[in-house]
């Protein structure tokens, strides 16, 4: 069972990530992490007739591949926790419609993967799930159409803008066994720093990442140097620097910080401005890049902090401010478990 220390859930017997899968589109296949994906498609329609159906297909492929790698079937999965950026999380619900797994829809914008992992770990730790699927996705074209402008409009992107990843990530959690350990989770509080610019999500989300990280460090008595990496997703280059500035003001130097939105693409070559974003960005980097490093023991202990801007197309048109949230999970290498006996 989990124990609570402040705002942080600790899992003395950590649930594990038994399997994971990452799917990406054309632009992701042109980036520096291309080799990390299980599957890449040069066709961003993924064989479908529209962008929204393409995202559903991508999420479905990620889920099926994850289950295949775990050598299990949908009927043996207790629950799926999933979400996306489409209205009412239709990419996730339409994908899960085909799998028949009990489904709880989540919305945390780009923070959804950490939200799903934290909730999933709590359910597994409490004995409520033997196998739990945590997954999320995003699609550049679907997100642009919903939140910004149709692609045919040809709007100029600002330097602070980020590129919504066409990607999906899925993890299968189990209460125990072999795999990367989920040792702790801290769920975020909504932060509002009066940002209204929809093309500067990093500025809106950086304070949320700082607030959640500071609470976790206080609750656990940890310091940034205790971790091989502190991953955020997805603040981009602008938001990442703002996070480091905010923490420096608190006396913390974040020398081991890596943002998923900064490593998925080559900003100099791929015209993504401030970097990647979208739930599928940090989810695919987690499943294709971070978890394999932990499995190999290249990294032993990391924090994964996913951030989300909680606006809608309606609140944006009403000129509301953009609140944000960040959820955190602590991940440890299975090799560290062996070393600790």
Go through each PLM region and give its residues.
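Short beta-strand segments
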Residues: 18, 82-83, 132-138, 302-307
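Condensing-enzyme catalytic core mediating Claisen C-C bond formation in acyl metabolism
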Residues: 1-52, 150-215, 219-222, 252, ...
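Short, well-ordered amphipathic alpha-helical segments that serve as non-catalytic structural scaffolds
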Residues: 55-71, 117-119, 204-219, 285-290
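Conserved beta-ketoacyl condensing-enzyme motif
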Residues: 17, 51-110, 226-241, 246
């Amino acid at each position: 069972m989990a124990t609570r220390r402040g705002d942080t859930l600790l899992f003395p017997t950590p649930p594990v990530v038994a399997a994971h899968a990452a799917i990406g589109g054309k632009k992701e296949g042109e980036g520096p992490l291309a080799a990390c994906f299980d599957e890449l498609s040069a066709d961003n329609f993924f064989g479908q007739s529209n962008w929204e159906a393409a995202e559903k297909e991508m999420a479905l492929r990620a889920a099926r591949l994850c289950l295949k790698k775990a050598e299990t079937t949908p009927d043996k999965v207790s629950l799926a926790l999933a979400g996306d950026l489409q209205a009412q999380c239709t990419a996730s619900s339409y994908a899960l419609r085909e799998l028949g797994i009990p489904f709880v829809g989540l919305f945390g914008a780009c923070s959804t993967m950490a939200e799903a992992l934290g909730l999933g770990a709590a359910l597994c730790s409490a004995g409520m799930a033997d196998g739990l699927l945590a997954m999320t996705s995003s699609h550049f074209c679907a997100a642009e159409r919903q939140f910004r402008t149709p692609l045919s409009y040809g709007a100029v992107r600002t330097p602070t803008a980020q590129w919504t990843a066409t990607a999906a990530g899925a993890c299968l959690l189990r209460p125990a066994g072999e795999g990367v350990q989920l040792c702790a989770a801290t769920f975020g509080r909504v932060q509002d720093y009066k940002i209204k610019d929809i093309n500067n999500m990093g500025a809106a989300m950086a304070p949320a990442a700082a607030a959640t990280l500071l609470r976790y460090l206080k609750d656990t008595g940890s310091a940034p140097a205790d971790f091989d990496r502190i991953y955020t997703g997805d603040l981009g280059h602008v938001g990442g620097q703002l996070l480091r500035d905010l923490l420096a003001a608190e006396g913390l130097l974040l020398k081991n910080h890596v943002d998923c939105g900064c490593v998925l693409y080559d900003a100099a070559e791929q015209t993504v401005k401030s970097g990647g974003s979208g739930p599928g960005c940090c989810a695919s980097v987690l499943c294709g890049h971070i978890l394999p490093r932990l499995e190999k023991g290249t990294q032993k202990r990391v924090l994964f902090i996913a951030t989300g801007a909680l606006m809608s197309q309606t609140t944006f048109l009403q000129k509301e401010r953009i609140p944000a949230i960040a959820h955190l999970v602590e991940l440890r290498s299975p090799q560290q478990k062996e070393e600790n006996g």
